[in-house]
């Protein structure tokens, strides 16, 4: 038995998230079903983290153990031939038995795309949050730094049974783009690319942080409310959770 690490890309639009569920199509279950066809037995995979319904991934990581009777290159080709077009294995590699896709993680990074034009192309609406309202970009930029460092992110997480909600955000940036390139096409427009890197994330944390920044840019939330939320542990009253379609798990760092 060898421990095999997979790096995976997927478009999460048509899935109920990463984790296998009793009802609903998931990324994990889809990959496991294809592995079952190849190895003729049940194969369970472990992911580096769960992505919610509609969230995409550029570099999700998962592992599985199997008796390998073919090269990794051939396995990757066979697996990709069985997978639907919105899931792709981009790399397979052998790793030590001690490697764990969750416990061995040092950092993760996410990207979030927002389009703030009055109109947004139908070809990318499944990958961006279309928000056609005027935003104070300088105030949003100022607010980003308030989220970096080691803090208790209780106020910015979803309902979860995770007891320790202290996380260290190493980097949180926003970049203005006048062109967004997906696949083989580039579309002109006004976009914001948020990127956040941390030692770990709570459920809905990235989407809540982006939603908070947008509310500040819209003038619906005072910038002082961020520190107040950290101190009280209570969610800002006007904060919204950004929709899932603009969110990408960028990479997992070990």
Swiss-Prot record:
It catalyses: uridine(38/39/40) in tRNA = pseudouridine(38/39/40) in tRNA. Homodimer. InterPro entries: PsdUridine_synth_cat_dom_sf (IPR020103), PsdUridine_synth_TruA (IPR001406), PsdUridine_synth_TruA_a/b_dom (IPR020097), PsdUridine_synth_TruA_C (IPR020095), TruA/RsuA/RluB/E/F_N (IPR020094). It comes from the Bacteria. Its EC number is 5.4.99.12. Keywords: Isomerase, tRNA processing. It holds the Pfam family PseudoU_synth_1. NCBIfam families: hisT_truA. SUPFAM superfamilies: Pseudouridine synthase (SSF55120). The active site is at 52 (nucleophile). Substrate binds at residue 110. GO terms for biological process: tRNA pseudouridine synthesis. GO terms for molecular function: pseudouridine synthase activity; RNA binding; tRNA pseudouridine(38-40) synthase activity. Belongs to the tRNA pseudouridine synthase TruA family. Formation of pseudouridine at positions 38, 39 and 40 in the anticodon stem and loop of transfer RNAs. This is tRNA pseudouridine synthase A.
């Amino acid at each position: 038995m060898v421990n095999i690490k997979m790096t995976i890309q997927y478009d999460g639009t048509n899935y109920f998230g990463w984790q296998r569920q009793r009802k609903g199509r998931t990324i994990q279950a889809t990959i496991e079903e294809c592995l079952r066809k190849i190895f003729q037995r049940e194969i369970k995979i472990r992911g580096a983290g769960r992505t919610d319904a509609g969230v995409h991934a550029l570099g999700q990581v998962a592992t599985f153990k199997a008796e390998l009777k073919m090269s990794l290159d051939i396995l990757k080709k066979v697996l990709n031939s069985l997978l639907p077009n919105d899931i792709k294995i981009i790399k397979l590699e052998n790793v030590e038995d001690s490697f764990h896709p969750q416990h061995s993680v040092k950092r993760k990074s996410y990207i979030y795309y927002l389009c703030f034009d009055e109109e947004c192309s139908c070809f990318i609406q499944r990958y961006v949050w279309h928000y056609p309202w005027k935003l104070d970009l300088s105030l949003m930029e100022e607010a980003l730094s308030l989220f970096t460092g080691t803090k208790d992110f209780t106020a910015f997480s979803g309902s979860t049974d995770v007891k320790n909600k202290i996380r260290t955000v190493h980097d949180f940036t926003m970049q203005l783009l006048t062109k967004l390139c997906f696949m083989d096409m580039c579309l002109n427009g006004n976009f914001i690319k948020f990127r956040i890197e941390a030692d770990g994330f709570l459920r809905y944390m990235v989407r809540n942080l982006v939603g908070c920044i947008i509310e500040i840019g819209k003038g619906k939330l005072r910038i002082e409310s961020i520190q107040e939320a950290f101190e009280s542990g209570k969610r800002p009253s006007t904060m919204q959770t950004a929709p899932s379609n603009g969110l990408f798990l960028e990479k997992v760092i070990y």
